[in-house]
Amino acid sequence: MIQVLLVTICLAAFPYQGSSIILESGNVNDYEIVYPRKVTPVPRGAVQPKYEDAMQYELKVNGEPVVLHLEKNKGLFSEDYSETHYSPDGREITTYPLVEDHCYYHGRIENDADSTASISTCNGLKGHFKLQGEMYLIEPLELSDSEAHAVYKYENVEKEDEAPKMCGVTQNWESYEPTKKAFQLNLTPEQQGFPQRYVELVIIADHRMYMKYKRDSNKITQWVHQMVNTINEIYRPLNIQFALVGLEIWSNQDLITVTSVSDDTLISFANWRETVLLRRKSHDNAQLLTAIVFDEGIIGRAPLAGMCDPNRSVGTVQDHSKINFRVAIIMAHEIGHNLGMGHDDNSCTCGGYSCIMLPRLSKQPSKLFSDCSKKDYLTFLKVKNPQCILNKPLRTDTVSTPVSGNELLEA
């Protein structure tokens, strides 16, 4: 039986109108201070895990009480999840950390059917939730009062860069559009049922990422875990579960040539993934997370309909924002291209301010797929019938032993 924890957040809700605070997400105006307080622990004598399977939080937002229900995202990691980094002399070091009792949750707001939440509880509450159609961020404050958190609307974060940010979808690797048009589905609402699919994901953080985060692999790891948790939340309506099977940090040097020309970097990464990564770690899709600034305002690139192809089931994503879910949205967008989704045009709708497959990142990023994207995805399943995303992640997915010189550490 799942023990449910009730935590009351006593809100000395102090909105600082017109003043600014510097948070991890950037400069924020108009925020509230909240103080979490645990009031209903698990029954006396019960074994309490570090992170409960289900939790509830009470808090006030804009002066109104809300209840946040959270459930652990148990499918976030595969059973053989591994982390790889490199020693100063270039040796590959792979560990298999125990991640069953992790701290990443999905959730909803009570009495708000349209609400969503993606929260980590690793060090306080950190993440985002949607309430009454608006996106809010929450994060702990670095104050002497360790329980203080800030809650604020996404729109109140000062924008880091007003320059347009675009996706550079790659279509010239294989002509998919003619086949797609021949099989284009005209779906009634009743037909838009999505079959269960599973994507085993590997994320590579390049050397610039390692330097950007001041050589702190733990920070990169938490950043990536939070991103994949959000990607899972985004794809839940399409019935796709993402399991992170591996995280690799190029801590010594890049293993490919990473340049500001996004197409060159994508091709180089795709070739490395096919010839090196696939031989030592079975997976369905690999994404390169880089701190380089790509030319022409591009922040992501991926081949169209490449999922399950050894050379095309890849993407590159620029770590362009201090706000985790903005980067997660770009990675979800690029994976959408891998799953057959083209860019939305003006005829596409999703019931939101913007849709996730727009060619440019909007000022109010959306986590919603349009009707066009859903049709594209179902058409991709029908035309390509990708086999690699049929199986659930298993512990036996490691297909070969590491080459001589690697260190294998069981944590």
Swiss-Prot record:
Any Gene Ontology CC annotation: plasma membrane
GO annotation, biological process: proteolysis
Binding residues for Ca(2+) 1: 200, 284, 388, 391
Disulfide bonds: 308-388, 348-372, 350-355
Record key words, sorted: Calcium, Disulfide bond, Fibrinogenolytic toxin, Fibrinolytic toxin, Glycoprotein, Hemostasis impairing toxin, Hydrolase, Metal-binding, Metalloprotease, Protease, Secreted, Signal, Toxin, Zinc, Zymogen
Activity control note: Inhibited by EDTA and 1,10-phenanthroline, but not by PMSF.
Cofactor: binding details: Binds 1 zinc ion per subunit.
Similarity annotation: Belongs to the venom metalloproteinase (M12B) family. P-I subfamily.
The protein's name in its UniProt record: Snake venom metalloproteinase VMP1
Lineage: Eukaryota, Metazoa, Chordata, Craniata, Vertebrata
